[in-house]
């Protein structure tokens, strides 16, 4: 489907020179003099190469239709990440380039949304929150529960975050998968 360059957004998939690209960022620039342009940063799906393109906002680009489906995460090996479609039990392998910064938050059985073009995964969307265990943090200090200060902690997936002073090692907490920030103590 041909669309004007100014309508391209992050997460869209474009076809250029017979290759598929996922849009990492898209910015419309309106200089004081000259023609407005769209600065688009993309990653080639086949090999992960990042490129940056500049189009006039009125130029047409080829946008590819993608389908979002739920998949369960199975495991990771040297070849990539393996997911299963719950209804048909079809399995797909997703490369490390596509998973990117979502990798530390993947847990066995976690349901994620994969954006698919034909049989190729082009993007992954995690649930907003994940429950993880604190494996290393400073000891709990009595009398600090009323303060709003935070202390550093390392989670079971290796991500570093800031937690309230009353959270100790071994505590399960809920974090945002977008940035790893603390939300609450887990209720399980």
Swiss-Prot record:
CC annotations in GO: cytoplasm
Compartmental location: Cytoplasm
SUPFAM superfamilies: Nucleic acid-binding proteins, Translation proteins SH3-like domain
PROSITE patterns named among the record's database cross-references: EFP
Gene3D superfamilies (UniProt xref): 2.30.30.30, Nucleic acid-binding proteins
PANTHER family: ELONGATION FACTOR P (PTHR30053), TRANSLATION ELONGATION FACTOR KOW-LIKE DOMAIN-CONTAINING PROTEIN (PTHR30053:SF14)
Record's protein name: Elongation factor P
């Amino acid at each position: 489907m041909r669309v004007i360059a100014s309508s391209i957004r992050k997460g869209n998939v474009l076809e250029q020179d017979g290759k598929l690209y996922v849009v990492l960022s898209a910015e419309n620039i309106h200089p004081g003099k000259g023609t407005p342009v769209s600065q688009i940063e993309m990653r080639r799906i086949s090999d992960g190469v990042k490129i940056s393109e500049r189009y006039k906002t009125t130029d047409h680009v080829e946008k590819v239709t993608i389908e979002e489906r739920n998949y369960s995460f199975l495991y990771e090996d040297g070849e990539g990440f393996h997911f299963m479609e719950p209804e048909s039990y079809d399995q797909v392998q997703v490369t490390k380039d596509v998973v990117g910064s979502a990798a530390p938050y993947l847990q066995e059985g976690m349901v994620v949304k994969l954006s698919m073009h034909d049989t190729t995964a082009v993007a992954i969307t995690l649930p907003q929150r994940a429950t993880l265990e604190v494996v290393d943090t400073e000891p709990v200090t009595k009398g600090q529960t009323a303060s709003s200060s935070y202390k550093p902690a390392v989670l079971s997936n290796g991500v570093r975050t800031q937690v309230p002073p009353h959270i100790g090692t071994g505590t399960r907490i809920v974090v945002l998968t977008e940035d790893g920030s603390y939300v609450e103590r887990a209720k399980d």
